[in-house]
Regions:
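Enzymes that bind and transform nitrogen-containing heteroaromatic metabolites
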Residues: 1-161
Length: 161
């Protein structure tokens, strides 16, 4: 399984100034539960915003720079990350360039919708989801955060595939 996961504002924003501009502990717990034991693929800016490897998961950072930290593996591309991950479950966790490149590989896209309107000079927008390629599931309430909604988009498969 290869999945993309992110939270998005009503304006389609996923980040401001290299950071996630909201904090919902229940959504962080859900993220941890879903991604635990899998391989995470992220860009360098996303890694720097987190500040450390996420425990219980393999952390692959797509970067042209070497990051010398225990628990981090540097790769040059999404394709190299997927080759390193092998048959493991993979979650693409940001940023925008990683999401765009991951679209051609993803089996599903797990989106949390936050009600927060945000602004800033350095905004990052969510990737466009092609509903010709991804079937939208139902809009569901978040299990732990009443203000949030979530939806999983599943890749449409060709007939006979």
């Amino acid at each position: 399984m290869k999945g993309i996961i992110y939270a998005v504002s009503p304006q389609g924003i996923i980040g401001v100034g290299g950071k996630i501009p909201w904090r919902y502990l229940g959504d962080w717990r859900r993220f941890k539960r879903i991604t635990m034991g899998s391989t995470l693929v992220m860009g360098r800016t996303t890694f720097e915003s987190i500040g450390k490897p996420l425990p219980g998961r393999r952390n692959l950072v797509v970067t042209s720079r070497e990051i010398e930290l225990p628990g981090i593996e540097c790769v040059r591309s999404v394709d190299e990350a997927l080759a390193r991950a092998g048959d493991a479950d993979v979650w693409f966790i940001g940023g925008a360039r990683i999401y765009s490149e991951a679209m051609k590989h993803a089996d599903l896209i797990d989106v949390t919708y936050v009600p927060d309107y945000v602004d800033g000079w350095d905004i990052v927008r969510a990737p466009a989801i092609d509903e010709g390629l991804f079937e939208p599931g139902p809009l569901l309430p978040h299990e732990e955060e009443p203000a949030l909604r979530r939806r999983v988009y599943t890749r449409r498969r060709a007939l006979g595939a």
